[in-house]
Structure formats: C-alpha cells, structure tokens
C-alpha cells in the first residue's frame, strides 16, 4: 500500500492555525489572522507532494503524524504545553464476503488507540483520532455481520509511562463465522509513540491471525488476506 498524501500548503496553514489557537488561546474565535504570518513550503517529490504517477493513500496516517510533528515543534518553543506522541493513526479494518444465504456483507470499521499524555494529565484510553467519532456497539456488529467479538478491552500499561502516562491502546478480537476477505490499513507497526521530558515511549500496534487449524500469523500493518 502507498503512504503518500497530497497536501495543499493552505491546508497545512489551516492545521497549524487551529493548533496555535487550541494550544495558546482556546477562548478566541477561529479566524484567519495567522495566515499571513506563516510560510509553508512542501518540496515536490516528497511524501506530502508526490509526483504523478505516485499512488495516493494513507491520508489519515499522514494527518496524524503531522499533528504529532506540529505538537513537538511548537512544544519546543512552549515547554509548558509540550505533549508526547499518541497512537497517531486511524486503523481501518475491512471484512467482506458472502454469508450462508448468499448475501453480500462488507464491514468497514475504524479503530481507536491511546491519546498522548499532556501537561494537564494522563492521556485518555481507547480514543478515536477524530474527536466526534464513537464506537459501533459490539451487539450491532454481531447482529448484522457473520462474526463474534471475543475481545474488546484496553491494553493495560500500553501507554508510555511517565508523570502523566500516555493513554492505553485498545485490544479488539474478532471470530469470523463465514469465509471472507479481510484488509488492514494501519500504522505504528515499526515506530513507538515517543515520550517527552523523561517520559517513556508507548507500545506499538500488532495484528495476529489465528486460523481454525490453530496456526498463528503475525500480520503487517497494511495487508489483504
């Protein structure tokens, strides 16, 4: 899977301005007064400005890493507001096929993770990258798709330890009841979310498939099976 994300410089300015306002003066109204104060240059041929025919994908992964980088850069100039890195991802899971009645099914689910520790306190556990997202109840999934949810819990001590620990990640286990195909589009498989001011890194993500015959396979972060 590709990891390129074509990002417009003006959009990057908007991200940066929203970050400034939320970080330094969250009581004021959002406005465009910061636009003329910021100069953004994204070099051609980079992961944020790929050149055709480079494939585009992973928008959510790159967006979250940009937020981490902005937080780290701005935090160096304002140490009292410095945050660690979070799970910085929007894990996508897909399961599709035909059920026993020959009806097509297709599940598309977005996963949650640990939000970074911050000066105000510990990071929240099992949270979406997007503030307004909520989880789909397990009972709904089991009623409408040929699967069972066997695990749905936070991963104890998976957030980076420190004065204000990082939020714990989420463990989600599926039992598939019908043959089908699964796709995973995730990140944080190789790199740990970093800590700051002496705080330690958090845990990476992993994916394990256990087949009906008992064989086990550790899967990469982006794959189809």
Spans of features found by a protein language model:
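Glycine/proline-enriched, intrinsically flexible loops and inter-domain linkers
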Residues: 1-225
């Amino acid at each position: 899977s590709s990891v390129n994300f074509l990002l417009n410089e003006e959009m990057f300015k908007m991200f940066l301005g929203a970050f400034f306002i939320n970080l330094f003066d969250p009581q004021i109204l959002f406005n465009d007064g910061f636009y003329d104060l910021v100069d953004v240059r994204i070099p051609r041929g980079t992961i944020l400005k790929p050149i055709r025919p480079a494939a585009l994908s992973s928008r959510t992964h790159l967006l979250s890493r940009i937020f981490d980088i902005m937080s780290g850069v701005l935090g160096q100039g304002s140490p009292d507001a410095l945050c660690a890195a979070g799970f910085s991802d929007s894990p996508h899971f897909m399961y599709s096929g035909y059920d026993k009645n020959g009806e097509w099914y297709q599940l598309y689910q977005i996963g949650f993770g640990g939000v970074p520790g911050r000066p105000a306190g510990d990071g929240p556990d099992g949270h979406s990258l997007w503030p307004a997202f909520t989880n789909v109840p397990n009972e709904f999934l089991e009623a409408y798709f040929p699967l069972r949810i066997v695990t749905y819990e936070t991963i104890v001590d998976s957030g980076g330890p420190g004065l204000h620990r990082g939020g714990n990640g989420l463990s989600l286990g599926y039992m598939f009841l019908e043959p089908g195909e699964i796709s995973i589009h995730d990140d944080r498989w190789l790199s740990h979310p970093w800590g700051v001011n002496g705080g330690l890194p958090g845990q990476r993500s992993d994916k394990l498939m256990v087949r009906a015959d008992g064989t086990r396979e550790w899967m990469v972060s982006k794959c189809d099976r």
